[in-house]
């Protein structure tokens, strides 16, 4: 019974906590802490570790304040058909990188480089997810008109499931990186929580976003 319990716990952990373990690999905190801390806390831990390793002082926390946010308009109330949704891929992180929105508090210019690393890693796993998903769909379409033996069909089905599992695994890896990258802007706008926060940088990010 003990082996069964351990096996079940291992599978549940693998399904639900893989992403936390993945993020914890780049955080200077214990795994248990990584599972419970917020994303602003994660960026704080990364930057504090960087500062200590490079002999840099930690900026003094500042009070938070209001700034102009994203553009929002309600043009019509009620049921609306023929609606099209357009979504930018990591809008705010992309704006920060494109326009190099960097705080003067970051004297080593490390924050933007770290954000670029996170986004680059995310795109890598997104590409792997897409490749695996495409292969799974190709096999699925092949099975619709497949006229081979039952053993060949069974082997193709196993291969399809393997590619689907690969796509799912890479999706789970890209998602926490997406969340971490998107929270970079939130950290900018919370200098009371994130010592490297900068309201001017946060407002410049939303300003460019409104004009995009």
Label each residue range with its predicted role:
Residues 1-97, 150, 158-212:
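Common nucleic-acid-contacting/processivity interface regions adjacent to the catalytic cores
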Residues 91-140, 178, 182, 186-187, ...:
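Metal-dependent catalytic core segments for phosphate chemistry
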Residues 124-134, 139-163:
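Extended, charge-enriched "interface" segments that sit outside catalytic cores
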Residues 28, 110-112, 144:
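Short, charged/polar low-complexity linear motifs in solvent-exposed/disordered segments
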């Amino acid at each position: 019974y003990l082996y069964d319990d351990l096996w079940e716990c291992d599978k549940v952990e693998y399904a639900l906590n893989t992403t936390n373990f993945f993020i914890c690999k780049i955080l200077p905190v214990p795994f248990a802490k990584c599972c419970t801390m917020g994303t602003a806390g994660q960026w704080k831990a990364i930057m504090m570790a960087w500062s200590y390793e490079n002999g840099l002082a930690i900026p003094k926390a500042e009070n938070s304040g209001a700034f102009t946010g994203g553009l929002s308009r309600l043009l019509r109330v009620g049921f609306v058909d023929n609606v099209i949704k357009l979504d930018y891929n990591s809008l705010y992180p992309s704006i920060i990188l494109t326009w190099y929105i960097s705080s003067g508090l970051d004297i080593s210019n490390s924050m933007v480089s770290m954000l670029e690393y996170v986004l680059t890693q995310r795109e890598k796993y997104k590409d792997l997810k897409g490749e695996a998903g495409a292969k799974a769909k190709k096999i699925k379409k092949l099975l619709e008109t497949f006229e081979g033996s039952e053993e060949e069909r069974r082997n193709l089905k196993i291969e399809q499931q393997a590619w689907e599992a690969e796509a799912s695994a890479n999706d789970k890896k890209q998602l926490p990186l997406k969340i971490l990258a998107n929270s970079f802007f939130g950290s900018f706008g919370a200098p009371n929580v994130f010592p490297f926060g900068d309201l001017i940088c946060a407002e410049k990010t939303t300003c460019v976003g409104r004009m995009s």
